[in-house]
Regions:
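Bacterial C-terminal helix-turn-helix
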Residues: 505-568
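Residue at a conserved register position within TPR or TPR-like alpha-solenoid repeats
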Residues: 24, 68, 101, 108, ...
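Residue signature of alpha-solenoid helical repeat architecture, marking inter-repeat boundaries
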Residues: 11, 51-52, 95, 135, ...
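Structural motif corresponding to the intra-repeat A-B loop/turn of tetratricopeptide repeats
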Residues: 27, 111, 131, 144, ...
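Amphipathic alpha-helical segments of tetratricopeptide repeats
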Residues: 41-45, 81-89, 122-129, 133, ...
Length: 568
């Protein structure tokens, strides 16, 4: 009986191919690596698990499919290894089996099964010594960091991302390390370490600037855009998102990250629309006051009314245009996700559409989109998206309470639903380390407790304090504004601060006199600031303290945005 023939020479998996693919990953020579794989399409299409280096090639294919190579689906290639002859899989070397688990982990990531993926990567990392391949270990750490980030476990994600970066640096692969730094910068941003996040991201951008790694360069621009949006710099955010879209389009006009940037751009335009709506409302209020004071002066009133109506029409046209453009961006993103299924991305599209419909007063459409977002998120146990959907549903129900819509025989039904959604959002947010998300959940619980049905300012104050503690020193622009809204509502209700009640009865707990004095100053200065028209100079004069101290205390209690340079 003759010896078993090996595959033809052009279908052999030689060490040179694996080395070339690895070098291109390390140097971020993306087009060269993809061209190399395209030239071996026959080899990949006919990949035989019994070949030498088959499992190693599979691991490298997983890396390149993640980068952007559009070869056979990873799950299809893995099935060939599942259908091995009896006993052959068990005869794989430890190194080959680890490579197989690497590929299975990436396949799970593609399916958004993050917990399953983490299990595969934990196995790989537990046998790091047996694998003796720092390149693959660096990738495994990085991939695990990405999974943890999606689950909202930011502290641990940062640890594993740092491990991957250090391994890459140790190998001299500085460009590969820079890719991992982009994720690191986002995680630091989520922890409120904005300056460090920007510094690391800019360093990564400098290292990758001469490469054709357009997806990572797009991710950097997207990161800058999301920072700008969170700070309320919506025009700048749109510029960054447009830049990100340009980068992604160079790699693939239907890239899923391009869809994500379209969804983010829609949210930025929504931010501009909200600012414009506030200006329209302020102008209308000012016009009503002016008209009332000028009664009897018909000529002047008529001219003013015409001017106001003209400005108002222009503003409303611009408002409608912004909302229309936002929905168009979301439709374009939705079309990409239909071709490249992604539950998290599609859920975000539903969410952002719901926000725009809510702003326009279309509660039914908003409710439908928010429910779809939660349903999509629940399928993958995507806690972050589930929390956002529940907060949005809480917002919609509160809007119905204020508009007195559909109360029927039970006028409290919408208020109770709002509270239930808010409470569920808090419970879900505690599964993550997303502090701003938890703060937002507490905020909307407080706004619900303050609505016209519950009218419970004392409970709302507790929620306010929890929200303030959760967002720490770096609230996003929209959360900071909501903090102001909730704080003002609590003050208008005229409730006595629970701390003052307790102190009046001698209940001081373990606090020292100095701590009580500092807390008393926070309470009094915040209330005087509201009474004095939110003017720091008036508070300083009235209480005979320095304006600097007033600003510091207001920032500490969340009544003034930290780092605000506005003088008053």
């Amino acid at each position: 009986m003759g010896a078993r023939k090996g595959p033809p020479a052009n279908l052999q998996i030689d060490a040179g191919l694996l080395s070339q693919l690895r070098e291109d990953v390390a140097a971020r020579e993306i087009e060269r690596g993809i061209a190399c794989l395209r030239s071996r399409r026959d080899l990949i299409a006919n990949l035989d698990p019994s070949q030498d280096n088959a499992a190693r090639l599979l691991a490298h294919l997983a890396i390149w499919i993640d980068i952007g190579f559009s070869g056979p689906p990873l799950q299809e290639l893995l099935q060939r290894f599942e259908h091995l002859e009896p006993g052959l899989r068990s005869k794989l070397s430890i190194a080959d089996y680890i490579c197989l688990r690497m590929a299975e982990g990436m396949a799970a990531m593609v399916e958004e099964a993050m917990e399953t993926a983490i299990g595969h990567f934990d196995f790989v990392l537990s046998l790091g010594k047996e694998l003796d391949d720092r390149f693959l270990l660096a990738i495994a750490c990085f991939w695990k960091g990405r999974c943890l980030r999606r689950r909202g476990e930011y502290d641990e994600a940062l640890i594993y991302t740092g491990k991957g970066r250090d391994l890459a640096v140790g190998l001299g692969h500085l460009r590969m390390a820079a890719v991992m730094q982009v994720l690191e910068s986002w995680l630091l941003f989520q922890q409120g370490k904005w300056k460090e996040a920007v510094r690391i991201s800019q360093a990564a951008e400098k290292v990758l600037g001469e490469t054709d790694d357009y997806v990572t360069l797009g991710n950097i621009q997207s990161f800058y855009g999301r920072m700008a949006r969170r700070e309320g710099r919506f025009d700048k955010a749109i510029e960054f998102f447009e830049s990100a879209i340009g980068h992604y389009g160079k790699r693939d006009p239907r890239h899923p990250n391009l869809a994500r940037s379209l969804a983010n751009m829609a949210l930025a335009k929504r931010g501009i629309a909200l600012q414009l709506q506030k200006r329209i409302d302020r102008d209308a209020q000012r016009h009503r006051k002016t008209s009332a004071s000028r009664q009897g002066k018909a000529g002047a009133t008529e001219v003013d009314s015409r001017n106001h109506d003209s400005r108002n029409q222009d503003s409303r046209r611009r408002l409608a245009q912004l909302r229309r453009e936002g929905l168009e961006h979301l439709e374009a993103a939705r079309a990409i996700y239909q071709q490249r299924p992604n539950h998290h991305g599609l859920g975000t599209v539903y969410m952002n559409a719901a926000y725009i419909h809510l702003d326009g007063g279309d509660f039914q459409r908003a409710e439908e989109e928010a429910a779809s977002a939660y349903e999509v998120a629940e399928q993958k146990q995507d806690y972050i998206l589930m929390v956002r959907a529940r907060i949005l549903q809480c917002m919609i129900e509160n809007a119905k309470v204020e508009e007195e819509i559909g109360g029927g025989a039970d006028p409290g039904s919408h208020a109770r639903r709002a509270f239930e959604f808010g409470q569920e959002a808090i419970d879900l947010a505690k599964h993550t380390q997303h502090h701003l998300l938890l703060a937002n959940a507490y905020l909307w619980q407080g706004l619900t407790q303050c609505n016209s049905f519950f009218d419970n300012p004392e409970a709302a104050r507790e929620s306010y304090d929890l929200a303030r503690a959760s967002c720490e020193a770096n609230p996003s622009d929209n959360i900071w504004q909501d903090l102001q809204t909730l704080g003002a509502k609590i003050l208008r209700k005229g409730s006595v601060h629970p701390a003052l009640k307790a102190w009046s009865q001698g209940a001081v707990g373990e606090k020292t006199f100095r701590q009580i004095s500092e807390e008393f100053a926070e309470i009094v200065i915040a209330r005087v600031w509201e009474r004095e028209g939110r003017k720091v100079s008036r508070v300083a004069a009235r209480l005979s303290i320095s304006p600097k101290k007033v600003r510091r205390i207001l920032a500490r209690v969340g009544r003034r945005k930290p780092g605000s340079g506005v003088r008053s």
